[in-house]
């Protein structure tokens, strides 16, 4: 493993163990989830308590924190991963679950109390598929927490539209087509409908450009 839970006492230490590309991805996904959730509110599709749903973006930032226990050689590999390496990568929700168990016991600090459950749901379940064929738990439909279903869409969108070590970024239109193709399979179809109708991806890129002016 890249790190041991026993050697770290704070979430800040854990985040420092991640490559910059991973933390930048986590930041983008958190911001995208925040924007998407606000769009969902306008479509009256978010039924969680007002205070809770306003925390979705902040909580979703932690979705990939379990990757701190994946060997750096895998996370930073410049080529496509082997099936064995993908098997290791797919363990990161398990490491996230262990981390949040430690956080709840007060052994690791750094995530505000009101975010812990939401962050845990995002980190543990964002690779579950709508049709139940995802990992690790094989849950489906509404059994997947809403924040995880939202994170799944935003995580996939950012992964497609951002450059990776082993490939160039895909276009916004390509990402939209992929989301549409896998709606009802990987993604909650109603969430995809709103993501596309509200053109969340374009709005996110516009916000990102404005923030750098």
Where are these regions (language model features)?
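Histidine- and acidic-residue-rich, metal-dependent catalytic cores
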Residues: 2-213
């Amino acid at each position: 493993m890249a790190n041991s839970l026993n050697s770290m006492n704070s979430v800040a230490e854990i985040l420092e163990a991640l490559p910059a590309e991973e933390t930048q991805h986590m930041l983008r996904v958190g911001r995208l989830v925040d924007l998407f959730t606000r769009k969902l509110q306008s479509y009256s599709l978010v039924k969680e308590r007002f205070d809770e749903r306003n925390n979705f973006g902040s909580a979703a930032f932690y979705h990939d924190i379990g990757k701190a226990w994946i060997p750096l050689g895998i996370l930073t590999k410049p080529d496509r991963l082997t099936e064995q390496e993908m098997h290791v990568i797919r363990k990161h929700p398990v490491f996230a679950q262990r981390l949040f168990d430690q956080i709840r016991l007060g052994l690791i600090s750094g995530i505000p109390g009101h975010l812990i459950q939401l962050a845990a749901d995002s980190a543990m379940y964002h690779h579950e598929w709508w049709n139940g064929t995802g990992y690790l738990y094989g849950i489906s439909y509404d059994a997947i927490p809403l924040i995880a279903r939202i994170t799944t869409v935003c995580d996939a969108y950012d992964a497609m539209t951002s450059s990776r070590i082993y490939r160039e970024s895909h276009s916004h239109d390509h990402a939209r087509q992929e989301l549409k193709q896998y709606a009802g399979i990987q993604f909650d179809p109603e969430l995809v409908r709103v993501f596309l109708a509200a053109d969340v991806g374009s709005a996110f890129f516009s916000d990102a450009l404005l923030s750098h002016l």
